[in-house]
Amino acid sequence: MTKILKYLFYSFVGAFLSITLFIGVFIYKAKRGINFYHTDPIELPLNLGEKSILVFSKANGFRHSEAIEASLPIYEQMAHKNGWKIFMTEDAGVFNELQLVLFQVVIWNNTSGKVLTDNQRTIFKKWIEDGGGFIGVHAAGDDSHQ
């Protein structure tokens, strides 16, 4: 009988600790976010041309999957119809001085959480100040919560 009670006791303690840990991680992520950054430059297509658009859909917070997936073909259709080149990524490594200047417009497509490092934010801000076009779609403003 004591073996059964010990087993039940340790099972209860284990379950309690597991649930507490899960809730703690969930609360931490909800309040502070857990950010993953891409800093290495990425491989871009060679045929970008003079009218090129970057569609950036990274989510370090809540991911609006349905909205992101539904919008990508629409951006492709618009680009094709207007003769624009389009590049879609969730890799923030493209936010560097050498690659960002290859685009005339950047669309933040339902981005959430803090998706750029401080250095990438500085580069992006300068790119906008130098005349780059920026469009923020739906949750793109969610980055301001951090």
Task: Label every model-predicted segment.
Residues 3-6, 51-52, 121:
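Basic side chains
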Residues 8, 35, 87-88, 108-109, ...:
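Mixed-charge, polar/low-complexity N-terminal
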Residues 14-102:
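Aromatic-Pro/Gly-enriched surface loop or interdomain linker
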Residues 1-19:
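N-terminal Sec-pathway targeting helices
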Residues 53, 100-146:
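Short alpha-beta junction capping motif
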